């Protein structure tokens, strides 16, 4: 999930893909990437309705006026657990090492760069564009977000290494212009997109993602993720499945990648101990903090946990007392019950010191599918397998 304190990427779909080269990895079994966290002064804050608005824009949904107003005004600024908001991965690009936000809901690798002003670079590790890379002539990129923020720049080809996995000639989108909203989160230096290359936003020719470049060099063309919160480290593994990280048997769901996302269908859902509901189609997205569902499911779950739950115009989303005990939310995938503990749904106070909390689940604003963001994913061991393609789910060990 791209945070930069307030943002998540909005995408445009393209059809053609440019090429990059993988370097054959030894040994071929795979590599592990561990979490990093930069030590920066001050307290990191997060714009909660900004997170929500940006997730909606990312998937082409209409942002309700109340959510937009709350996001722009910054009326719900808070400090949740660090690992509940963003998942950073150390990435070496040329001679520079940056901490990038790991995002399975986008297909761009874009970074803070030496093309920014010195004040914009302050506190960030940046990609030195004059070091080893080669500028891709005529190529550019530009993104905009639900809170009004934006970034754009040039494209370079360079060597990119993540946890020992190396791609040569990888497209790197170097920020040349950036709005002020991006500068607040000093931990985060950019984005590592891991969706399908068909939605890469480089113009005029979309580029391959890092994963699509390197997957042929791995023992298996997959990556596996263990997202965790409350200060525990998370892990990203390329090329192999680590049986020590999950319990039981992996349950697989077919992926529909026609729109460029890791989209799957769960057989049913359940609120608490209630009856099973209908099937749910959604996207597995590490780049979205929240779990976005049909509004009827959201209201049903929150009303069961606290009858006074409300969709607050001032907070820009569903809120409830922080003391409320919320029911678990379960989705069944090929016979496996993936459980989101109720405590995860109680995400964060709407503002520092508030007794009202912002819901970790929010409405999908009628887009017709769900977004299985970090609120869901951090309770699971998840395998993103390009063969099929398919997704594997199991309870974390």
UniProtKB/Swiss-Prot annotation:
Enzyme Commission identifier(s): 3.4.23.20
InterPro entries, per the entry: Aspartic_peptidase_A1, Aspartic_peptidase_AS, Aspergillopepsin-like_cat_dom, PEPTIDASE_A1, Peptidase_aspartic_dom_sf
Occurrences of domain Peptidase A1 (ranges): 87-394
Any one annotated GO CC term: extracellular region
pH dependency: Optimum pH is 3.5.
Disulfide bonds, paired cysteine numbers: 322-357
Cellular compartments annotated: Secreted
PROSITE patterns the record matches: ASP_PROTEASE, PEPTIDASE_A1
Pro-peptide positions on chain: 21-71
Molecular function terms, GO-annotated: aspartic-type endopeptidase activity
Signal peptide: 1-20
Reaction(s) this enzyme catalyzes, per UniProt: Hydrolysis of proteins with broad specificity similar to that of pepsin A, preferring hydrophobic residues at P1 and P1', but also cleaving 20-Gly-|-Glu-21 in the B chain of insulin. Clots milk, and activates trypsinogen
Key words of the record: Aspartyl protease, Disulfide bond, Glycoprotein, Hydrolase, Protease, Secreted, Signal, Zymogen
Residues annotated as glycosylated: 311
SUPFAM superfamilies listed in its UniProt record: Acid proteases
Main location: secreted
Temperature dependence: Optimum temperature is 50 degrees Celsius.
Induction trigger: Repressed by alkaline pH and in presence of ammonia.
CDD domains associated with the record: Aspergillopepsin_like
Summary of subunit composition and partner proteins: Monomer.
Job of this protein: Secreted aspartic endopeptidase that allows assimilation of proteinaceous substrates. The scissile peptide bond is attacked by a nucleophilic water molecule activated by two aspartic residues in the active site. Shows a broad primary substrate specificity. Favors hydrophobic residues at the P1 and P1' positions, but can also activate trypsinogen and hydrolyze the B chain of insulin between positions 'Gly-20' and 'Glu-21'.
Further information: Used in the production of blue cheese. During the fermentation process, aspartic protease hydrolyzes casein which leads to clotting of the milk.
Family in the record: Belongs to the peptidase A1 family.
Protein name from the UniProt record: Penicillopepsin-1
Species assigned in the record: Penicillium roqueforti
Chain's gene name: aspA
